[in-house]
Amino acid sequence: MIQKKKEWEKTKAEGFARATIDNFLDEETCMKLYEECMNAPKGGWTVFTRAGSHMEEFNDLISLPTAHKVTYDIMHSGEFLYELEQMTGISGLLPDPHLVGAGYSILRNGTVLSPHYDFNWNDRLRLHRKLTSLLYITPNWKEEWGGHNVTWTANPELDPTAKIVESVAPLFNRFVISENVPKGPVHGVSKVECPNDVYGRCAIRFFYYISTSEPDKDNPPHRSTYKSNEYSHHKLHEEEHWDGHYVGQGGEDYGYKPKK
């Protein structure tokens, strides 16, 4: 993702940082995510309604093998966090293993997500939300079906002078990521107008956080302390570095290979 660094810096200078990456995963894995989303246990779904919004959500991924592996083997991995830090210039990024507000989402035909800005604090982790990302997973999505992720300069329902900054179509295997800023960015999803035989605008969401805590003055930072603090710490062997592929615990190769 380092090749997206210039796009990130350019959009940050315009008001808020964002990037779009097409063909993010291999198609087979992305299709498995979609099929899994369609067949996820009905009892795990919730519906979010507010100010005209209507969105279905599923965040208990432990029973869904593909989403669980993609989340924890790729999106929450140290390698991927490093790639995010290199692209964004933000250090100390942390994933949310509990997936508060994250996981699968569906907007059905005729629904919208009204203009808003996101929650900024994860009370369970005691961390501030810094990045929001989505991977769109409905195959063969057409731009004329709507469901675009739209960003404005202000909330258009409150400010008639608000202008559209960006409108991104939810095309299959497209990954979008943006930086959360104070009271922004204001965004929403345009009306979904897909055929009735299309399941809906499906995505899987991942959020990333940072800590703003400072060291405890009564217990300042220190290394592991021994009787003697003389030590050595060096590599035992010279070997090839990681090749850039994310491999699951079962040996699955998910095909994502960051470009340097």
Residue map of PLM features:
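A structural signal for short, well-ordered beta-strand segments and their strand-loop junctions
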Residues: 20-21, 47, 94-97, 103, ...
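A structural signal for well-ordered alpha-helical scaffolds and beta->alpha junctions
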Residues: 26, 30, 68, 77-81, ...
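Short amphipathic alpha-helical segments embedded in low-complexity Lys/Glu-rich regions
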Residues: 51-55, 101-103, 194
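Short, flexible beta-strand-to-coil junctions
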Residues: 52, 137-140
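Catalytic core of Fe(II)/2-oxoglutarate
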Residues: 110-111, 118-129, 139-260
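Eukaryotic charged/polar low-complexity linker/IDR segments
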Residues: 132-136
